């Protein structure tokens, strides 16, 4: 499979210089006179597969966008194996610039033809890194000064970040062969070289969001009292210093101190800073919303109410999100282990040779965690504990670190896989450690509104019923009733189930390279929590939250997650 019509490939002809005259071949233009063998590497992205969904395949692929498939340079290492098939320090290849790739175009596809001169024919292991990091370039260009070959040094190397993933920058996506590549170089015919195909994959992963409802607005029905405030509106108040603020959740009431004239009550926070306003005929700017004036002192009042059947048709608009536990490091080449976490290997496929898990540089340490009430800043950025403690109510403030605006249109990918929320790195722990404190998850913030989507302001929950005023709470449940406060009508939904292969006995809640994890919220059964409250050692406490996943790999392996709250 070509990535976006580009053959991510390089025809690397290795002219093996012979030691005897018997190996001399006809000398054509630009051909070496003495060769042991010629090798052509055809390097491309993995082709599509019709296999059933598993830890390597998902049933769906996506070509990605242009910047995710561009090749600017490469490191190719060929390590000559000894008679026992072991790596040696006899290596060829190295760092190749764009110019050194000798770019050509054939049938609309880009092909690269770099040349190498090798000393011997025989068996070689091949490691291909497209768009390598500076540290990998340094290894490739260095003199051999350690006990390990360049092949081993690069394959065992890792990349670490604090959030700005440079190996996922446009035109700089690092890609590495997924399988161990061995080739027996035999041909000494320049026109008919030994050919070996190499599949490469991106080292990073991607989390996307598909918009299921226009403007991310979801209808739902909530339980409430048998009466409800008859009218709620929004408007503007102008402070004495001319600062204008928008007030939501202004409830219409009778002013009992002034012949039952209309007054609008704003609950404030927890009902402790209630204020009363008078609606004027003036409107604010181009909004069409009325300007309100403050009424002091605060009057005795009685809400206008209407009878209900104990239910209200409301909406939840998802407006913010925060990804949690984004891994800060990844190996350059695939690292894998079996179910026991005792036998490790570099390069290969899950499900082959008893390989059960991918491995990231922090996997072993995460597997040893017993105290989950930590931020784990050495493993993650956007660590769950830090996001959990964040003050989200002012998420639009410049000081807000974790929460971002949830997209309302697919503007950076496509309709199938949605809008990219983030590129990320592998995050893998053994099955029994796949708990919220250690797996990658997501928190959504919702804005509660009436059936039209208009915010209802601060609301209250008591005995699984929802109220728009504290008076209604106490009238229905007694003066001493305890309740949850949804400040400004905000609620929160959390899921730790960004799954790789849902229900798998190993790679269930995991992030794996070259996969797109597509999140789609299909609906709600209830309003989320008033605050972000997550048990780091257990599952979500919201029993109305459901998550489903299907998946697929290369060019990007797409794994769909349908979420119902």
What are these regions (language model features)?
Residues 2-6, 18-565:
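Sec-type signal peptide cleavage vicinity
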Residues 13-16:
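Bacterial Sec-type N-terminal signal peptides, specifically the leucine/valine-rich hydrophobic h-region
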């Amino acid at each position: 499979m070509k990535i976006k019509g580009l053959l991510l490939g390089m025809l690397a002809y290795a002219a093996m210089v012979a030691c005897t005259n018997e190996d001399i071949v006809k000398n054509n233009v630009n051909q070496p006179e003495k060769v042991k063998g010629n090798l052509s590497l055809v390097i491309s992205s993995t082709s599509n597969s019709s296999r059933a969904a598993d830890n390597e395949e998902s049933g769906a692929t996506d070509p990605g966008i242009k910047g995710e498939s561009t090749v600017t340079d490469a490191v190719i290492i060929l390590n000559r194996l000894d008679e026992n098939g072991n790596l040696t320090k006899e290596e060829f290849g190295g760092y190749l610039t764009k110019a050194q790739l000798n770019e050509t175009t054939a049938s609309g596809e880009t092909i690269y033809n770099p040349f190498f001169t090798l000393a011997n024919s025989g068996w070689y292991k091949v490691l291909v890194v497209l768009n390598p990091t500076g540290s990998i370039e340094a290894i490739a260009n260095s003199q051999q000064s350690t006990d390990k070959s360049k092949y081993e040094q690069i394959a065992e190397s890792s990349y670490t970040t604090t959030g700005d993933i440079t190996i996922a920058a446009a035109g700089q996506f690092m890609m590495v062969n997924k399988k161990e590549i061995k080739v027996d170089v035999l041909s000494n015919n320049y026109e008919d070289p030994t050919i070996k195909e190499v599949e490469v994959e991106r080292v990073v992963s991607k989390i996307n969001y598909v918009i299921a409802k226009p403007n991310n607005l979801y209808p739902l029905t909530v339980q409430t009292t048998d009466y409800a405030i008859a009218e709620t509106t929004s408007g503007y108040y102008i402070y004495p210093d001319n600062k204008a603020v928008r007030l939501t959740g202004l409830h219409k009431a009778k002013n009992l101190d002034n012949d039952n004239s209309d007054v609008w009550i704003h609950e404030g926070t927890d009902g402790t800073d209630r204020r009363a306003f008078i609606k004027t005929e003036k409107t604010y700017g181009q909004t069409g919303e009325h300007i309100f004036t403050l009424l002091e002192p605060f009057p005795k009042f009685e809400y206008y109410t209407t009878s209900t059947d104990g239910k209200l048709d409301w909406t939840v608009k998802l407006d913010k999100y925060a990804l949690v536990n984004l891994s800060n490091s990844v190996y350059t080449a695939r690292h894998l282990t079996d179910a026991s976490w005792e036998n490790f290997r570099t390069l290969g496929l899950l499900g082959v040779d008893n390989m059960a898990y991918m491995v990231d540089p922090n996997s072993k340490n995460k597997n040893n965690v017993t105290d989950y009430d930590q931020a784990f800043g050495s493993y993650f950025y956007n660590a769950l504990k830090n996001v959990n403690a964040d003050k989200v109510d002012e998420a639009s403030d410049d000081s807000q670190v974790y929460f971002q605006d949830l997209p309302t249109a697919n503007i950076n990918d496509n309709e199938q896989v949605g809008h990219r929320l983030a590129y990320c790195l592998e995050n893998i722990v053994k099955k029994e450690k796949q708990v919220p404190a250690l797996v990658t998850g997501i928190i959504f913030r919702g804005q509660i509104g009436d059936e039209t989507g208009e915010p209802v302001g601060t609301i209250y929950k008591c005995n699984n019923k929802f109220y728009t005023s504290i008076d209604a709470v106490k009238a229905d449940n007694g003066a001493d009733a305890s309740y949850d406060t949804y400040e400004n009508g905000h609620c929160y939904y959390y899921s730790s189930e960004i799954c790789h292969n849902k229900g798998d006995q190993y790679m269930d809640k995991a992030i794996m390279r070259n996969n797109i994890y597509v999140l789609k919220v299909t609906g709600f059964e209830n309003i989320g929590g008033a605050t972000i409250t997550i048990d780091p050692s257990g599952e979500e406490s919201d029993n109305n939250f459901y998550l489903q996943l299907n998946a697929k790999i290369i060019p990007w392996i797409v794994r769909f997650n349908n979420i119902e709250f």
